[in-house]
Structure formats: C-alpha cells, structure tokens
Amino acid sequence: LKKNLSNLEESSKKDMLFEVFMARLDILNSYRKSIKNLLKYLSSNPQDFAKIFPSFAESIILMATISNIKVNGIKGLANIKVIMILYFLIIYTWNKDETESLEKTMTTLDNYLTNFDKLSFVF
C-alpha cells in the first residue's frame, strides 16, 4: 500500500483517505476471487476474524497515518473506529461491484466520506 501511494499529494484528509481506500481496493481487486472467497468464509466463521484482527487493525492505522489522520488518544481511537466501519461498509459494496472501474464503490465511498466529513469531530 505504501508503495502504491508514494506520490500521494497533500490535500484534505477526506481526499487523502479516499485515495488510500481506492489504492487498497485496487490491490484487493488484483486478488478479487481469493478475497471474495475469504470474505465468504469469514461471514460463515466470524470467530476466525479474531485471528487476523491484529493485522487488520494495523492496516487501518496505516491507512489513517498515510491520510494524516490522528491515531493517538481518544480522538485517534474514534478515528480508527470510524475508518474500520467505513472499511466494512466499502468492502461490502466492493464485493458486489463487478465493474472494472469500481464506479459504484467509488461513489459510495465518496458519499460516506462526505457524510463523515460533515461531522466536525471525525478526522
């Protein structure tokens, strides 16, 4: 993910987080069939998500850090939780979006980020 975002331009946290999410989804798209199988498995065996949760949490923290979003303290914890919720919502949309351009996923992500951006305490 860091490699794909090495030339990420400084802009608003919302725009940067959008770019980070889309870079992540582009990577996942390369392994779409396997990721979809993993999501299907985890939905049937949610207890196994606990085994990969530490790596998932680190990934969310990395996404926030790259986007210049605070990850320390109470506000940082709230930011991490919001990004996790966004991630689950977007993965659900991505899983159903069969278009090559991921247009539906991009639109949904932008709408969610816009709504969260309106909340002054987030990000």
Sequence positions of predicted segments:
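Hydrophobic alpha-helical connector segments
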Residues: 3-37, 44
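Residue-level recognition of alpha-helical structural elements
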Residues: 10-13, 17, 45-49, 72-79, ...
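Solvent-exposed interaction surfaces and binding hotspots enriched for charged
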Residues: 11, 32, 49, 60, ...
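Amphipathic alpha-helix face/heptad-repeat signature
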Residues: 17, 24, 52-55, 79, ...
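Membrane-helix exit/interface motif
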Residues: 32-39, 63-68
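Amphipathic alpha-helical packing segments from all-alpha helical-bundle domains
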Residues: 46-69, 77-88
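C-terminal peripheral helix-coil segments that are non-catalytic and often amphipathic
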Residues: 65, 96-123
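Hydrophobic alpha-helical segments that form the core
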Residues: 75-95, 108-115
